[in-house]
Amino acid sequence: PKLSQDEIDDLKDVFELFDFWDGRDGAVDAFKLGDVCRCLGINPRNDDVFAVGGTHKMGEKSLPFEEFLPAYEGLMDCEQGTFADYMEAFKTFDREGQGFISGAELRHVLTALGERLTDEEIDEIISLTDLQEDLEGNVKYEDFVKKVMAGPYPDK
């Protein structure tokens, strides 16, 4: 899909915010490509991010906006996880069908399956989603999925 000028302006605003955090050199580190896209409301898989120019480590490559834009457009067309996909994945760990899994199982799912997050990334996600365990150490995974899919700025 072709982006309108308003959409491109919105992309540029978010890109410039990442550039501001990244040293104000007119470019964003390619390692942050997926993060920029997620802030813009798409949820690309890491393999797809790498395929359009994302990198595995900070400092390998910088992306000016002119290179970011076609990468973003390419990622718009990629398969993305849906709410139903994530709910179905968590249901497999919900033995009693009550909508809860243990905090330990949540960590296991996030470190061992799919995109395999680091412990630091999981700590950050749990902190950002303000995830609360009940007295038995369980979390309501529907709330978790909704908060993660809403992104870091859900009111935007």
UniProtKB/Swiss-Prot annotation:
The lineage of its organism: Eukaryota, Metazoa, Spiralia, Lophotrochozoa, Mollusca. One of its GO terms (molecular function) is calcium ion binding. Keywords: Motor protein, Muscle protein, Myosin, Repeat. GO terms for cellular component: muscle myosin complex. InterPro entries: CALM/Myosin/TropC-like, EF-hand-dom_pair, EF_hand_dom. PROSITE patterns: EF_HAND_2 (PS50222). The keyword Signal does not apply. This is Myosin, essential light chain, adductor muscle. Disulfide bonds: none annotated. Gene3D superfamilies: EF-hand. In molluscan muscle, calcium regulation is associated with myosin rather than with actin. Muscle myosin contains two types of light chains: the catalytic light chain, essential for ATPase activity, and the regulatory light chain, a calcium-binding protein responsible for Ca(2+) dependent binding and Ca(2+) dependent Mg-ATPase activity. It comes from Mizuhopecten yessoensis (Japanese scallop). Pfam families: EF-hand_7. Residues 6-43, 81-116 form the EF-hand domain. Signal peptide: none annotated.
